[in-house]
Swiss-Prot record:
Keywords: Cytoplasm, Phosphoprotein, Ubl conjugation. This is Arrestin-related trafficking adapter 6. It comes from Saccharomyces cerevisiae (strain ATCC 204508 / S288c) (Baker's yeast). GO terms for cellular component: cytoplasm; cytosol; early endosome; late endosome. Residues 182-202, 593-614 are annotated as: Disordered. It is found in: Cytoplasm. Interacts with RSP5. Disulfide bonds: none annotated. Belongs to the ALY1 family. Pfam families: Arrestin_C. It comes from the Eukaryota. Residues 593-610 have a biased composition (Basic and acidic residues).
Length: 915
């Protein structure tokens, strides 16, 4: 059972979801004793930095070094401390004098030094004194299970109990498996830490008794462990960290005693039980750091140092180191790979030559394409073509401890990479060397006719990383104290006959070139090619076999460093070399000139060498001095390979049909009837598309809805009484005070209510029923202020309250305001809003059947034209004849308007305008 340590902090994953966090069963420990083993597993075994130009490196995001320290405890053990240190050291050697009086000086500089103190037994947060350890000690600390207690005391991120047999498949130890099994709330991550802990945070730490890491995933040293000398990289690294957690039952005091033993200083020391304790770490590496360098008089090395201190006078501290390789890549904006070096010149009006070097940079253990074109202008002989590579190393250090800089240049190294000679002359003087240029013929002659013609040559020059066991080619560096520069040099040996004598000339063409580490191939610098990992289907819909897709797109024209002939040669055959992510740093090379192919003991090896010799005997590769024995297939990919094919998108490619296209003037209707797969004549409607997608639109039955009515929430007045007093209100308008001008909304005195007495067939769908509030003018403001927002019609005049602008307040959800949608509504009897008469208000044919209460007869429809007096316009088409029991809508509206002070505002404004 796996146990995790988590806190509710910022999450940052340390391992990719597909990688295992634990060591493989067959992994070799860095160091082991009879009681424990130590492993270090890195998420990326190589750290890549970008950019060779010093300007702009600070703007590039730092690279990340992440991994886990695995302490496998075989027997119960007591440890004092567990820590891991990431350290980078630059060293420049300066030998002077001649032996035996030779003196050697060295300039050592620390590039980076960062420590993760995962566990510290002397820390009070990891040990309890005997006086605090009592029978009720379990009640003084938080509730946790037995495994959680191990995590808290050990400071580990993950604890894996020992098993009788190692798991056959480690895939279940990946973070992806953790997420699928719901064993963790987040990805494996560190917990950030700051040197300043707030008061509230200190209380939380005191309650949880959780140790704080420096920049580790689950450290066990408090934040002030480093004091004021906290590394500046610690805080950056802490931003990426968090841990796992689990909660469980509280162990009994007897169980707690199994993990604590008293020591000499009256403290209880935690005992590490058998199992795997995984400590995860993460550290950003700035792009300005130098890459790993190993030269003759200088070096830059990065190492992870693991220190485990044990209790006991006769038990030594366990110390081991793991080297970290840092490689520098060109920046993302670099175009040197795609820029060619082109030289076009005439030599003494005798020969015109064009030289094209396809790239300004080359990867070690790869091939550089170079093309030549020669056009003779006179009788001239070209005996030989040679291609060299030169390397110069420059060292800088402080002179005698002062700030003065001392420079030292190492002798320039010159390596012959390729050579193309003319044919051997038939008559050579005895004792002369046949390999000399003067004993070679003219390579510009036609092989059949023997005439002097234009010639083109194409070479694929192999650039090895190692020539002998002691001579290596170092990539370009960006470090100011150790600089490596490279030049490519092309030499042409020509001769011209003057009379009886022949004079020889040497043309030298030099150009700077960047040499990159072999890991800087396209397989590590370009994004994955998803098209090359499609699952192709045949015409029957069957997927292509995986064996056919394994080598798909293994060659691409953009991958100029690995020619197609080499990719198909046995040096890249899967039967020769096994796929392995851990790429060897050195590749053996075999000298190809003046050496015969030795017989192999094995027939298979002999057959492979014969096939390889045939490949390198081609015109493009025969001139190479060195050839590779084997090349990792991972480096030859034109783009990076997806790390997780399971989580990558699987795209299906359907091949095109072989059937011919239809005629230009074919009948689509007839073709559609005959062919069920043809395009229909009419495009599908919107509802057809939704139906095909399985989406159903909601159906609304309009006949089952009822329109709400507007009613006044005061005592009812008959329309007759309103009619009698309608024009009497005009004389009282001038007597009203102006103190109510701030609240003159005609709609603020209404609310939505239902009329249960009048049937829905007599109600216009757009004109709700109104009833007067019948408020006195003196108490109108006081009563309005006490109205609830949910019972007042939304205001449109002089109202800034947000509660009056919600449509949900108009149609309340209470039983009094709700109306059943199941009631039927006759749409045939609905009339336009401007067509209002007595027949609409009340029908004579069925009035006796639906009106039982005389008060119900006062309900009438309200029209938007009710504010206009019909006497003002002679062209009015409305019928305003009202019986005794009915009131004129205009008079009713005027009374309402008078109570709301609308006309008062109008008259006041009109008088002020006349003045």
């Amino acid at each position: 059972m796996l146990q995790f340590n988590t806190e509710n902090d910022t999450v940052a994953p340390v391992f990719p979801m597909e990688q295992d966090i634990n060591a493989a069963p067959d992994a070799v420990p860095l160091v082991q004793t009879t009681t424990l083993q130590v492993f270090v597993k890195l998420a990326e075994p190589i750290v890549f930095l970008k950019g060779f130009e010093t300007n702009g490196l600070s703007e590039i995001a730092p690279s990340i070094l992440r991994g886990s320290l695995i302490v496998r405890v075989l027997k119960p053990n007591k440890l004092k401390s567990i820590s891991i240190t990431f350290k980078g050291i630059s060293r420049t050697e300066w030998p002077e004098g001649i032996p035996p009086k030779r003196e050697e000086f060295s300039d050592v500089e620390t590039v980076v030094n960062h420590t993760w103190p995962f566990y510290q037994a002397d820390d009070g947060m990891n040990s309890f004194t005997l006086e605090h350890h009592s029978s009720n000690n379990s009640s003084n600390r938080p509730s946790m299970s037995d495994e959680d207690y191990l995590l808290e005391k050990s400071g580990a991120s993950v604890y894996i109990p020992p098993t009788a047999e190692p798991p056959k498949d480690n895939s279940n130890l990946s973070l992806d498996a953790y997420e699928r099994n719901s064993l963790s709330s987040d990805n494996l991550s560190n917990k950030p830490v700051s040197s300043d802990v707030s008061h509230d945070d200190s209380k939380l730490l005191a309650i949880q008794k959780t140790p704080l890491p420096s920049s580790s995933r689950r450290g066990s040293v408090p934040a002030n462990f480093h004091g004021n000398s906290l590394s500046p990289h610690t805080f950056i690294s802490d931003l990426f960290t968090k841990t796992f957690s689990n909660s469980g039952a509280t162990p009994s005091p007897e169980q707690e005693d199994n993990y604590l033993t008293p020591s000499k200083d009256s403290k209880e020391v935690f005992i590490f039980r058998p199992g795997d304790y995984i400590y995860t770490f993460e550290q950003p590496i700035s792009q300005s750091y130098p890459e790993s360098i190993k030269a003759n008089f200088g070096s830059v090395e990065y190492k992870l140092s693991i220190d485990i201190e044990r209790f006991g006078a006769f038990k030594s501290t366990i110390h081991t180191q793991l080297p970290i390789k840092v490689v520098r890549l060109p920046s993302d904006g670099s175009v040197e790979e795609t820029e060619a070096i082109a030289i076009s010149k005439d030599w003494k009006d005798l020969l015109h030559y064009d030289v094209v070097i396809f790239s300004k940079e080359i990867v070690l253990n790869a091939f550089l394409p170079i093309d030549f074109h020669f056009a003779p202008l006179d009788k001239v002989t070209l005996h030989r073509i040679r291609i060299y590579l030169t390397e110069s190393m420059e060292y800088t250090c402080n002179s005698n401890g002062n700030h003065e800089k001392a420079r030292r240049l190492e002798p320039t190294k010159k390596f012959l990479l390729a050579e193309h000679n003319g044919p051997k002359l038939p008559h050579i003087p005895a004792g002369s060397n046949p390999l000399k240029a003067k004993n070679r013929g003219n390579i510009l002659l036609d092989e059949k006719s023997g005439d002097l013609v234009n010639k083109d040559f194409q070479f694929e020059v192999f650039v090895p990383s190692k020539f002998t066991n002691s001579i290596r080619l170092h990539p370009d560096t960006n470090y100011d104290k150790i600089k490596a520069h490279h030049w490519i040099k092309i030499c042409l040996r020509l001769s011209k006959k003057y009379g009886d004598n022949r004079k020889h000339f040497e043309i030298s063409i030099d150009s700077p070139i960047h040499i990159l580490n072999q890991l800087c191939s396209h397989a590590n610098t370009l994004l994955p090619s998803y098209e090359s990992h499609f699952q192709y289907c045949d015409e029957d819909g069957n997927f292509a076999p995986a064996a056919d897709q394994q080598n798909y797109a293994s060659h691409h024209d953009s991958n100029i460093f690995f020619p197609k002939e080499v990719l198909s040669s046995p040096v890249l055959s899967p039967n020769v070399q096994k796929m392995n992510i851990r790429i060897p740093s050195d590749l053996p090379v075999v000298r190809n000139r003046a050496e015969s192919v030795k017989k192999s003991k094995s027939d298979n090896t002999s057959k492979k060498n014969d096939q390889s010799s045939n490949v390198f005997a081609s015109k493009q590769l025969v001139a190479n001095i060195y050839k590779p024995n084997q090349i990792p297939r991972e480096l030859t990919s034109p783009q990076a390979l997806p790390l997780s094919p399971i989580t990558s998108p699987i795209l299906n490619y359907q091949p095109l049909s072989n059937s011919p296209p239809p005629d230009f003037d074919f009948d689509l209707a007839k073709r559609g009837a005959a062919d069920s797969h043809a395009i229909p004549v009419d495009p599908p409607s919107y509802f057809d598309v939704l139906k095909a997608d399985g989406i159903e639109l909601p159906y609304y039955d309009t006949s089952s809805s009822k329109i709400p009515e507007l009613k006044l929430n005061k005592s009812r007045e008959t329309l007759a009484s309103i009619e009698e007093d309608s024009f009497n209100g005009w004389s009282q308008i001038d007597d009203l005070s102006d103190e109510d001008d701030n609240d003159g909304d005609i709609a603020s005195g209404f609310n939505f209510k239902l009329s249960t007495s009048a049937p829905s067939e007599n109600v216009n769908s757009h004109t709700p029923i109104l009833q007067s509030l019948n408020m006195s003018l003196d108490g109108r403001k006081k009563n309005r202020a006490s109205l609830h927002a949910t019972s007042v019609l939304p205001s449109t005049i002089r109202q800034n309250n947000q509660h009056f602008n919600d449509i949900n307040q108009m149609l309340g959800s209470s039983d009094e305001d709700a109306f059943p949608k199941s009631q039927s509504l006759n749409f045939n009897k609905k009339l336009p809003i401007l067509k209002i008469n007595d027949n609409v208000i009340q029908s004579n044919s069925n009035s006796n059947n639906r009106v039982d209460n005389p008060e119900d007869t006062v309900d009438s429809s309200v029209d938007i034209t009710a504010f206009y007096d019909p006497r003002m316009s002679s062209d009015s088409k409305f019928d305003w004849e009202v019986s005794k029991n009915h009131v004129d809508p205009a008079a009713y509206s005027v009374n309402v308007a008078s109570e709301n002070r609308v006309l008062d505002d109008f008259k006041k404004a009109f008088r002020e305008k006349r003045k």
